[in-house]
């Protein structure tokens, strides 16, 4: 993914990396494919709890090992201006994850196929959780998922 912005940055973000951008006081930007190889990327927007700040752009490469059969907290390396966390995992085996039942959660299947709390999900599906104390993932084939932990 190629990132270009009005502050003069031109960056090629490698496959599997996570990019964080906070537009703050304002920035114009574009994201696009920098090669002839087809690519796919997700763009997620979370409303900040701080405004009129300096624009920030950074990225981090998370490895497969960082995410294999566990949730990796993306927001530890790339903090966001909100009471929220983004977690990412690649699952090849069944997995249970404890939740705080006072928070809200949303899980999105980036790729693969799995059952989450007895709901069958495939690539592109999502499921929300309120007042739950755990997520039980049963893999049907290798699955990559993003878990949103929200206020």
Model features per residue range: what roles?
Residues 1-151:
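Jelly-roll (double-stranded beta-helix
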């Amino acid at each position: 993914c190629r990132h270009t912005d009005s502050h003069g940055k031109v960056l090629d973000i490698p496959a599997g990396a996570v990019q964080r951008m906070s537009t703050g006081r304002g920035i114009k930007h574009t994201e696009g494919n920098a090669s002839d190889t087809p690519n796919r990327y997700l763009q997620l927007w979370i409303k900040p709890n701080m405004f009129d700040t300096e624009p920030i752009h950074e990225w981090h490469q998370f490895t497969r090992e960082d995410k294999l059969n566990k949730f990796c907290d993306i927001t530890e390396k790339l903090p966001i201006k909100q009471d929220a966390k983004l977690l990412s995992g690649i699952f090849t085996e069944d997995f249970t994850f404890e939740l705080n039942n006072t928070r809200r959660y949303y899980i999105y299947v980036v790729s693969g196929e799995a059952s989450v709390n007895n709901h069958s999900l495939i690539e592109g599906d999502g499921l929300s959780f309120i007042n739950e104390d755990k997520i039980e993932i049963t893999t049907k084939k290798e699955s990559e998922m993003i878990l949103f932990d929200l206020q």
